[in-house]
């Protein structure tokens, strides 16, 4: 699949790190470092603009290493880039740790995953079919 992209960053285009990678790393495109205090959030620009085909979205997801090792994650995970959006891709990062975290220019801050999606058409009804689960939710199937 080919996707049109404008790269106004000072970095290479996102790429798949391994043959089986689902996501491509997004890099911070910032003039000076950003310090995120504990529980603070900010939008980090990437310098990237994309044009997706209709029927596709780009999902902005956390990098597992950044979340596990530093407590920094994507706040609205997954963030969605719609096919008709033409603005710069930004990443909403939040620091969930107890320590300050410094974001440097070029740092890998999130993953971008291209995904196909469907448009739903609602069919309004008076009742839904029964299942063994019924209305059980929020842990109703057990915790272990």
UniProtKB/Swiss-Prot annotation:
Q: Which residues bind substrate?
A: 63-65, 76, 80-82
Provide this UniProt record's keywords sorted from A to Z.
Answer: Hydrolase, Magnesium, Metal-binding, Nucleotide metabolism
* Entry-linked Pfam families: dUTPase
Query: Biological process GO terms, please?
Result: dUMP biosynthetic process; dUTP catabolic process
User: What pathway does the UniProt record associate with this protein?
Assistant: Pyrimidine metabolism; dUMP biosynthesis; dUMP from dCTP (dUTP route): step 2/2
InterPro entries assigned: dUTPase, dUTPase-like, dUTPase-like_sf, dUTPase_trimeric
Q: GO molecular-function annotation terms?
A: dUTP diphosphatase activity; magnesium ion binding
State its Enzyme Commission number(s). 3.6.1.23
Endpoints of the signal sequence? none
Cofactor(s) recorded for this entry are: Mg(2+)
Q: Which domain of life is it from?
A: Bacteria
Q: Which reaction does it catalyse?
A: dUTP + H2O = dUMP + diphosphate + H(+)
**What biological function has been recorded for the protein in this entry?**
This enzyme is involved in nucleotide metabolism: it produces dUMP, the immediate precursor of thymidine nucleotides and it decreases the intracellular concentration of dUTP so that uracil cannot be incorporated into DNA.
Give the family per the record: Belongs to the dUTPase family.
The entry's protein name is Deoxyuridine 5'-triphosphate nucleotidohydrolase
* GN (gene name): dut
């Amino acid at each position: 699949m080919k996707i049109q992209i404008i790269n106004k960053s000072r970095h290479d285009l996102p790429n798949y790190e391994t043959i089986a990678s689902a996501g491509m790393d997004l890099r911070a495109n910032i003039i000076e470092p950003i310090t995120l205090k504990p529980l603070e959030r900010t939008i980090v620009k990437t310098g990237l603009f994309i044009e997706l085909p209709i029927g596709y979205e780009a999902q902005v997801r956390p990098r597992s290493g950044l979340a596990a090792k530093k407590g920094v994650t994507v706040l609205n995970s997954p963030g969605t880039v719609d096919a008709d959006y033409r603005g710069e891709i930004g990443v909403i990062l939040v620091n969930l740790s107890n320590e300050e975290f410094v974001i440097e220019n070029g740092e890998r801050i999130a993953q971008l995953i291209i995904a196909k999606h469907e448009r739903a058409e609602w069919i309004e009804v008076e009742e839904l079919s029964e299942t063994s689960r019924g209305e059980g939710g929020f842990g109703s199937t057990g915790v272990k």
